[in-house]
Amino acid sequence: MRSDSLWETTATNPPRQGAAPGPGGAAAAEPRGATPTGLPVSMKIVVAGGYAVGKTTLVGTISEIEPLTTEADITVESLGVDFAGPVQGQKTGTTVAMDFGRITLGPDMVLYLFGTPGQDRFLFLWDELVRGAVGGVVLVDTRRIEDCFPAVDYFEHLGIPFVVAVNLFNGVYRHHPREVREALSVPANVPVVLCDARNRLHVKETLVLLVEGALRRAQQHA
């Protein structure tokens, strides 16, 4: 059965509310070519989205090193603040600063992944996490699609290339990417893909798509 909230958003296309704060000096970095020393080019990628959308899972799935996570147990004080809707009760921890991982794409490129905290009270950390990033992945749960509005608005405001990745949760209706694009009102140049955050191949293909787009954009502005 289709998500009512998604179709209501698609039908009305209201302005996205609750955007993350504007840039405090944060700026997108342009990917550079191969270094003169022959060392791999490193790129910073930010993984953003709502609370309990799967950011920690995505980073952990693809990272070739033990991912650094900064999770804390959900306490009674979190009730009414950290609400995960349909997945409430399944999530016992929450990211309070960031997730960090690394993946090597070929012999000449290394990606450093930074996952943002999903709660509104940690939005002040975004400027530092995004500083120097070449692109972002906005992870979406279609049952709570409005939770990703701040991330979409933030990347659009900074002019940072990003990909919208719809996380494929078990037992959840799979909307066509076109429906999600309409619900988010993102332009045609922003890729919208289906991505199971638990599937390494899905995550890798999403990151490759993002990097290719960031490189093309950098070449166009060179």
Q: Language-model segments: which ranges?
A:
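Flexible phosphate-sensing "switch/lid" loops adjacent to ATP/NTP-binding sites
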Residues: R2, R102, R121, V186, ...
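Conserved G1/Walker A P-loop phosphate-binding module
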Residues: R2-Q88, T92-T94, G101-Y112
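Conserved beta-strand segments of the P-loop GTPase G domain that flank and frequently precede/overlap
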Residues: L113-T116, G136-D141, V164-L168, L194-D196
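Inter-motif core of Ras-like GTPase G domains
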Residues: Q119-R144, D153-L158
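Active-site-adjacent beta->alpha loops and helix N-cap segments on the catalytic face
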Residues: D147-F149
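A general structural detector for well-ordered alpha-helical segments in enzyme core domains, enriched
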Residues: A151-Y154, E179-V180
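A short helix->loop->beta-strand "cap" motif at the edges of active sites that frequently abuts
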Residues: L158-P161, N189
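Canonical P-loop GTPase G-domain recognition
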Residues: N170-A222
